């Protein structure tokens, strides 16, 4: 049985604002926490609902009068991170960090996980990260998994990618096609977002693997600037893991040939604009300094030499937080933090006001709607779903135009099972009014 909630999309009037205006002042160095009480209250409004509120039919109306119905399809998931639709349009695969690949068919979660997954490490943020289908999946049944891998008895973990054939709830012909040179503490984040580009190549993000973010000194962090390491990079490989001959650093004997771009912290979102063919990424900063970047081959995106964020100690990451020659500035950034996860360009017809928009899932418990102009200028269109008070990990569009999101309650905890799969559906104004009449008084929406 599915349960529904009608929630608004809080859509602000679009405005063109210079980057200098968007930036908010950084706090005074040396503070205990980079977030003020006001910022914390903004991210957790006093009338925010809990994730459990999806069990109750509640209508929240936005100032713009645009609402969505939220349908819970699955619950009890343990840190779900990635979801993908099979070609039939009604079957989904979902990754759980605990090392399980789950199947949802016709809106029902199969209690039995997919069998045959590769061995992986599950310490801290390790485990199964992401899943993506081969562009020719309908014929070859290939899918790809990103996950953390150890090398016991030696210390350290890294990100790996395996290819396998999916057949009715089991994996066969499993082959590890890439083991990244990103061996560091299991406390460090892995990245692991994957997507096939229009060129048929597989793009993979590798995190900065920094397990010391509460301190100001890190041995892993500077490797994001080194072409001899996979840390802090976007990689580009063929579907078998081999290196394309046209990769930007393939002729540099000292560089890793898989590298497409570098100078990243943690890229958790990758999307291609179907209108322009441009590649965009969302980058998760430490405390503030989250970014949206226009991704280009061979470019350096600055981390950690340039960042508007702070270490969790409260000190600035960089003594030059904005621009350095030879490094790309972000097209858009957040201060205070938004914690962007995955993102999509919405192309469906179910939500006309969202069509063509970039939708970015946020671990700060909201989803952002952004509009990218032809000149790559980004305009913020507003946020939605902050009333649910859950962390959004992934967002996807179904073949029939609905929007699906994965949520979790908190970042860590291998036994946590508070994750959900939600479907967003359009709601006509008459239906919202009818449900309001049936349910009585409504909780007001919280403006962003």
List each model region and its residues.
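Bacterial N-terminal signal peptides that target proteins for export
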Residues: 1-9
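N-terminal signal peptide c-region/cleavage motif recognized by signal peptidases
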Residues: 18-20
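Acidic, Gly/Ser/Thr-rich repeat motifs that build Ca2+-stabilized beta-propeller blades
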Residues: 24-210, 269-272, 278-285, 336-375, ...
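Surface-exposed loop and turn segments in beta-propeller and other repeat-based domains
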Residues: 113-126, 174-190, 230, 239-260, ...
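Beta-propeller blade signature
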Residues: 159-169, 222-240, 295-296, 419-425
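Flexible "stalk/tail and boundary" regions
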Residues: 239, 373-374, 415, 422-442
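Repeat-solenoid scaffold signature
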Residues: 255-291
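Conserved blade-ending motifs and adjacent loop-strand segments that build the rim/top face
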Residues: 264, 377-399
């Amino acid at each position: 049985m599915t349960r529904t909630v009608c929630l608004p999309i809080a859509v602000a009037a679009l405005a063109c604002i210079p980057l200098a205006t968007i930036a908010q002042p950084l706090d005074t160095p040396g503070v205990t926490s980079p977030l003020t009480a006001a910022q914390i209250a903004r991210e957790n409004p006093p009338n925010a609902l809990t994730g459990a509120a999806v069990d109750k039919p509640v209508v929240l109306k936005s100032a713009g009068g645009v609402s969505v119905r939220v349908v819970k399809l699955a619950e009890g998931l343990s840190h779900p991170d990635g979801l993908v639709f099979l070609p039939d349009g009604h079957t989904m695969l979902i990754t759980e960090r605990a090392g399980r690949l789950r199947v949802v068919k016709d809106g029902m979660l199969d209690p039995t996980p997919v069998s045959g997954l590769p061995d992986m490490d599950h310490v801290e943020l390790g485990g199964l990260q992401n899943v993506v289908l081969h562009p020719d999946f309908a014929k070859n049944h290939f899918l790809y998994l990103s996950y953390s891998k150890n090398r016991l008895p030696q210390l350290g973990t890294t990100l790996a990618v395996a290819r396998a054939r999916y057949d009715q709830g089991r994996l066969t012909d499993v082959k590890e096609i890439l083991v990244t040179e990103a061996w560091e503490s299991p406390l460090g984040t892995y990245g692991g977002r994957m997507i096939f580009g229009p060129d048929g190549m597989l793009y993979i993000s590798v995190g900065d693997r920094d397990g010391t973010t509460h301190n100001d000194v890190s041995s892993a962090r500077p490797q994001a600037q080194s072409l001899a390491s996979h840390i802090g990079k976007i990689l580009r490989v063929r579907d078998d893991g081999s290196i394309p001959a046209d990769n930007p650093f393939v002729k540099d004997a000292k560089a890793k040939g898989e590298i497409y771009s570098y100078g990243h912290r943690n890229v958790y979102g990758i999307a291609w604009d179907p209108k322009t063919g441009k590649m965009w990424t969302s980058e998760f900063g430490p405390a503030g300094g989250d970014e949206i970047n226009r991704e280009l081959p061979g470019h350096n995106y600055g981390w950690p030499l340039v960042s508007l964020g702070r270490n969790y100690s409260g000190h600035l990451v960089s003594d030059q937080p904005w621009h350095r020659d030879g490094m790309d500035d972000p097209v858009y950034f957040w201060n205070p933090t938004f914690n962007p996860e995955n993102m999509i360009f919405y192309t469906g017809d179910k939500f006309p006001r969202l069509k063509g928009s970039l939708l970015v899932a946020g671990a700060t418990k909201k989803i952002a709607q952004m509009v990218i102009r032809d000149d790559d200028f980004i305009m913020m269109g507003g946020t939605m779903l902050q009333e649910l008070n859950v962390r959004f990990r992934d967002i996807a569009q179904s073949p029939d135009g609905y929007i699906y999101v994965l949520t979790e309650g908190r970042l860590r905890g291998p036994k946590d099972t508070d994750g959900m799969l939600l479907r967003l559906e359009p709601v006509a104004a008459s239906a919202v009014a009818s449900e309001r009449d049936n349910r009585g008084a409504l909780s007001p929406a919280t403006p962003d």
